[in-house]
């Protein structure tokens, strides 16, 4: 049906274009038909030796006075003339000249008679009545009708949203009276606390008496906050499916368009429709696009966005109450939202959707592995242990990549090899071609083993999981460490261990090859340790300056809604002391890394030879070889090093 409608519209537009072209052509020929036909014929019928040209009316009068004009033919109600002349200037050769006669030159015929010039006036052709009607009446009507039709049906005017300009103020929210998203609470794992909050909302909608009997009121709004990929939108899909009430869904960016006032009008229209369908749920995804703090950032506020936000605040909890409308918002930038939007009465609850813990990852992997044939050697528990810091979206992508790899290798089930390769692709990037056995490859091997050795002998660092010389992404070599589950609290020794391990690659280069052979491969390592050491001094109070927070985490974020006055506020001498303390920390850690490399010089050579032979070495094999030469402590905290 849509195809037929599109064909009809296309045919109509083609017809309008053709009719307009025909009428314009007809009108053009009608206006200059005489000079384009009769006078043109006269010119074309002149002897080839005759000079043909155009002449101004003033020059024509000069020819007349000089007696050089022989004959004149008048056309188009004396608006055009074909003049036969001969001029001594051109050797008295015959000339056929076209002259445009200005309006009001009524004395021309008198002058021709006065100079005894042979002339003839040719009557204008009768205009076709159909052409007259078509050009003067029908064409403007067709043009206006076509313009109105296009204006009302064009998707381009509606900001690409499929709306006509006549309905720009209408809400673009998708409405489903009985939504079937295909997602239920059974399909959600790893975020049990958030799921419990939403199950309570569903229970309130289905059994309100159970809550109202004790004086409870249903929350007006729930704000989902968390990193990308943790399942905020998935929760919204689940509540839409489970609540069995009308559901509106819209993105925050869909409110504001190029026209002033559209955003506020769409908010009003959305809540009007929601009130008519109450009880219902309104889901606003990426609400930070419209709910950003007012008047903040460079250049102050944006009037259109702030007007939209003001309307949203009024609709959620203003003078007029929208009973039975539950607003669910989702964002990963709650820190930049306007305070008025976050207060109780608008968003009564803020549900934090964190990255899943180990048990949560196991549950998520089980959900996404339902329709995938896994080999007997695949352990979801081991995979969950290996992937701390992965979001639900990351885990879903990991199993999907493993399934794609199994298909590529023409296997009927997903084995451990595909799962491991998929994890490596997500963490490090797509594998490149193996490097040739050159000096650079040996240097990279020592660099990566330097990271692994320093990280392994430090008690506050974590276990090595894998060392590889296979290029991935922009890295020539990689050393993976298995992170601990809880990274929210890091001790000073743990931070120093990170810096020492990061500098271990450069330390190995200097010890093995000498200071003149130290390469640029540790450039990203130096950036990491400088940033970490600076945070130890300015944010964590882990230096001789004392327990002072000299810099805020959001410093420099003015374009994201931060305050212009939130920069660093300390004297120049304090800035010099900060630089000195950062330098002291990095120098100490680098000396410690060199010391560790020197103490383990023999085993480093053995491990490098094994690594060059195998390209990849797992953590167990590495520790087994290392433990024969040194005593390894118990492990604690995370890090991944890259050689660029």
Swiss-Prot record:
Q: Which Pfam families match?
A: AAA (PF00004), AAA_lid_3 (PF17862), FtsH_ext (PF06480), Peptidase_M41 (PF01434)
Q: Which residues form the active site?
A: 448
Give the GO terms filed under biological process for this record. Answer: protein catabolic process; proteolysis
Which residues point to the Lumenal side? 33-128
Q: Per its database record, what is this protein's job?
A: Acts as a processive, ATP-dependent zinc metallopeptidase.
Q: Which family does it belong to?
A: In the central section; belongs to the AAA ATPase family. In the C-terminal section; belongs to the peptidase M41 family.
Q: Which NCBIfam families match?
A: FtsH_fam (TIGR01241)
Subunit details: Homohexamer.
Q: What is this protein called in UniProt?
A: ATP-dependent zinc metalloprotease FtsH
Organism lineage: Eukaryota, Sar, Stramenopiles, Ochrophyta, Bacillariophyta
